[in-house]
């Protein structure tokens, strides 16, 4: 199957909501070694985001059940084994993506926009690994995630408009990383607020094609700020999970 056919099959799989098939097609496109077009890049991202998202969601549900079955040994053991199975799947998916990023995508990125997109993706998939990691391995994974986000952030500040959806999406996810992985609500809030304020100040630079994407991410930044501010003020409510891109 040539590259065009693989891309067409990936689009078909997306419409059928068969994201594992979609990811497999886009993995093969990536492994051909050329730089991906914007469309191909987005297809790859959507495919793996759905594939990993299903496991992240399952992992959270099963972890919660496992915590609630304390005292019921048999049930807890079954929950633990199932959680570990989901974790193994999640790790395999993340390592798949990280391999593609390191071997092909980051090295082949000729434009700052692509470089930021892929470094953000690298930060994201290390963050997903960090969510299920423990012990000594976790510290290294967290450091890898932070470095990728920071590298992307530095490029985005000099090469992209504050209203660019990729720059905004990066700020959103980097702030979620600070809040949920590093437990630094102040840093998370200041990063999200700065990104939101800088974008608001330059709303007139918003291009028509990215208007919808940019304003949606700005809304998520604002929602997270509202949620996190109430959390840090000792809200009685259970800590909310931040929206991400």
From Swiss-Prot:
Listed PANTHER family: 14-3-3 PROTEIN (PTHR18860)
Its keywords, alphabetically, are:
Cytoplasm
One Pfam match: 14-3-3
Spell out the family assignment given in the record's similarity comment. Belongs to the 14-3-3 family.
Which InterPro entries does the annotation name?
14-3-3, 14-3-3_CS, 14-3-3_dom_sf, 14-3-3_domain
Cellular localisation: Cytoplasm
Protein name, UniProt field: 14-3-3 protein zeta
GO BP, one example? regulation of ERK1 and ERK2 cascade
| Function, in words | Adapter protein implicated in the regulation of a large spectrum of both general and specialized signaling pathways. Binds to a large number of partners, usually by recognition of a phosphoserine or phosphothreonine motif. Binding generally results in the modulation of the activity of the binding partner.
Listed SUPFAM superfamilies: 14-3-3 protein (SSF48445)
Q: Which gene encodes it?
A: ywhaz
This protein's major location comes to cytoplasm
Q: SMART domains under this entry?
A: 14_3_3
**How is the quaternary structure described?**
Homodimer.
Residues flagged as site, Interaction with phosphoserine on interacting protein: 56, 127
């Amino acid at each position: 199957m040539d590259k065009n056919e693989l891309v067409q099959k990936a689009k078909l799989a997306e419409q059928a909501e068969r994201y594992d098939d979609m990811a497999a097609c886009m993995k093969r496109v990536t492994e051909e070694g050329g730089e991906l077009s914007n469309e191909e890049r987005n297809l790859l991202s959507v495919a793996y985001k759905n594939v990993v998202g299903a496991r992240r969601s399952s992992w959270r549900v099963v972890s919660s059940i496992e915590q609630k079955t304390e005292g019921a040994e048999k049930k807890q053991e079954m929950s633990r084994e199932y959680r570990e199975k989901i974790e193994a799947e999640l790790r395999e998916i993340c390592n798949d993506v990280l391999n593609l990023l390191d071997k092909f995508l980051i090295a082949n990125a000729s434009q700052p926009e692509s470089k930021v997109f892929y470094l953000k993706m690298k930060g994201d998939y290390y963050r997903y690994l960090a969510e299920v990691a423990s012990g000594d391995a976790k510290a290294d994974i967290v450091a890898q995630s932070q470095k990728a986000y920071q590298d992307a952030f530095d490029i985005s500040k000099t090469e992209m408009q504050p209203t660019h959806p990729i720059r905004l999406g990066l700020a959103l996810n980097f702030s979620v990383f600070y809040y949920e992985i590093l437990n630094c609500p102040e840093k998370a809030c200041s990063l999200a607020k700065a990104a939101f304020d800088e974008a608001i100040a330059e709303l007139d630079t918003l291009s028509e094609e990215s208007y919808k994407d940019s304003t949606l991410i700005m809304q998520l930044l604002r929602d997270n700020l509202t949620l996190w501010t109430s959390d840090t003020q000792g809200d009685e409510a259970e800590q909310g999970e931040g929206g991400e891109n």
